[in-house]
Amino acid sequence: MTKKICIAIDGPAAAGKSTVAKIVAKKLRFVYIDTGAMYRAVTYIALKNNIAYEDEKAIATLLQKTVIRFEPGEVQQVFVGEENVTEVIRSLEVTNHVSIVAAHPSIREALQERQQVFATEGGIVMDGRDIGTAVLPNAELKIFLLASVEERAERRYKENMAKGFAGDLGQLKKEIEERDHLDYTRTHSPLKKADDAIEVDTTSMSIDEVANKILSLAELKINN
């Protein structure tokens, strides 16, 4: 029987976390938990209810009454209550404001509690900004993905084009730099590499190369 370890994958925006995490989870037959989608879902409910992104108290109150859940599929489906928000949470409006919402301490605490519940049985791959440091500090395997700003902007540009979103590469680079600043400097659970995390620079690596590296590391932990 496969040992049910927890794998934490952290890193900045567009470093390839979600794509790699999905591949690793599928290969290991683990459950994938997209914590970024949870923060995007909260940002979306603020947008939908005309709540200012800076209004932490109002968003936290709304979140208490909101169920965020995942359903498996070829593309994992994200629901807010009964509404399928899988596509809308990837909109430019949500993308450009999620770091503001994610910086609110009460929002992070509420979502971290939910994320920890998901992980109680093990056998999960969870990606985000503070998984190895705050959400799953005892995860058996912690990965910290990096890539240059230029490479990440190029990846996000291609993603947007594939989804039919018009985009400006220079503007995307600027937005990623701004998100990095917010993520690294926020007071509550900033983005940082856990002391026991393994750093992987993905700038010159393909998605499969990154996934295979993590799978090799995971197999060592599973078989240890």
Swiss-Prot record:
Residues binding ATP: 11-19
Gene Ontology, cellular component aspect: cytosol
GO molecular function, one term: dCMP kinase activity
InterPro entries per the UniProt record, alphabetical: Cytidylate_kin, Cytidylate_kinase_dom, P-loop_NTPase
Subcellular location: Cytoplasm
An example Gene Ontology biological process: pyrimidine nucleotide metabolic process
Main location: cytoplasm
Residues forming coiled coils: none
Enzyme category, top tier: transferase
Assigned keywords, A-Z: ATP-binding, Cytoplasm, Kinase, Nucleotide-binding, Transferase
SUPFAM superfamilies named in the record: P-loop containing nucleoside triphosphate hydrolases
Catalytic activity: CMP + ATP = CDP + ADP; dCMP + ATP = dCDP + ADP
Pfam families: Cytidylate_kin
Superkingdom: Bacteria
Keyword ATP-binding on entry: yes
The EC number(s) this enzyme carries: 2.7.4.25
Matches recorded under PANTHER family: CYTIDYLATE KINASE, CYTIDYLATE KINASE/PANTOATE-BETA-ALANINE LIGASE
Family per similarity comment: Belongs to the cytidylate kinase family. Type 1 subfamily.
Record HAMAP family: Cytidyl_kinase_type1 (MF_00238)
NCBIfam families given in the database record: cmk
Protein name: Cytidylate kinase
Organism from which the protein derives: Listeria monocytogenes serotype 4b (strain CLIP80459)
Gene responsible for this protein: cmk
